[in-house]
């Protein structure tokens, strides 16, 4: 049912010309992921994890699925969400509430890029509730999201250049 809705969402919407289309999928390797890989020419996947060990199992399955020859979707990198918390009244203190280093460990183990470690930050939820993206702002959290966006945009630009170069040769 979800795969059918995704197929309809992708194929029936009048998207127009897009620079980027980001899809936030549930963790794992289910029908949704495979359907998407079959119906859309994907530039790449960003694997999002959290620091907990239990999250690593899903991430490992996702990495393996995207690397299957019949799927073969490049992995742009890993983002570790909820990496740490910095209290407003103690800006020099970091708390690793859910553990530490899972994103780095996975990136190293699978020779992937660790794109970002996103903090637990109440202002992100507050901004979202008012319709303001987390990337907007002048604080370190906004800068982290801006850096992530720029890294992904650079990766996609390089990939697109490679595709054009291969077509011209």
Feature map (PLM): residue ranges:
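Alpha-helical scaffold segments in soluble metabolic enzymes
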Residues: 4-9, 35, 61, 65, ...
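Helical hairpin unit composed of two closely spaced alpha helices linked by a short loop
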Residues: 40-80, 84-85
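Glycine- and other small-residue-rich loops at beta-strand/loop junctions that grip anionic moieties
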Residues: 25, 48, 95
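Switch II (G3) loop of P-loop NTPases
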Residues: 1, 5-35
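C-terminal lobe/tail of nucleotide-utilizing enzymes
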Residues: 67-169
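Short amphipathic alpha-helical segments
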Residues: 34-37, 59-60, 90-91
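Conserved active-site and cofactor/substrate-binding residues in soluble primary-metabolism enzymes
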Residues: 1-4, 31, 40, 54-57, ...
């Amino acid at each position: 049912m979800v795969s059918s809705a995704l197929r309809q969402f992708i194929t029936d919407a009048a998207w127009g010309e897009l620079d980027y289309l980001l899809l936030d999928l549930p963790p794992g390797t289910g029908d949704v992921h495979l359907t998407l890989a079959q119906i859309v020419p994907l530039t790449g996947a960003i694997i999002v994890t959290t620091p907990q060990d239990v999250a690593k199992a899903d991430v490992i399955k996702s990495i393996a699925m995207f690397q299957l020859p019949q799927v073969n979707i490049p992995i742009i990198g890993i983002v570790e969400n909820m990496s740490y918390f910095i209290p407003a009244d103690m800006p020099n203190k970091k708390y690793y509430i859910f553990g530490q280093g899972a994103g780095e460990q996975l990136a190293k183990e699978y020779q992937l890029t660790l794109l970002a470690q996103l903090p637990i930050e109440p202002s992100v939820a507050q901004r979202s509730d008012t319709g303001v993206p987390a990337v907007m702002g002048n604080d370190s959290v906004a800068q982290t999201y801006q850096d992530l966006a720029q890294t992904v945009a650079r990766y996609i630009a390089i990939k697109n250049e490679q595709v054009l170069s291969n077509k011209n040769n």
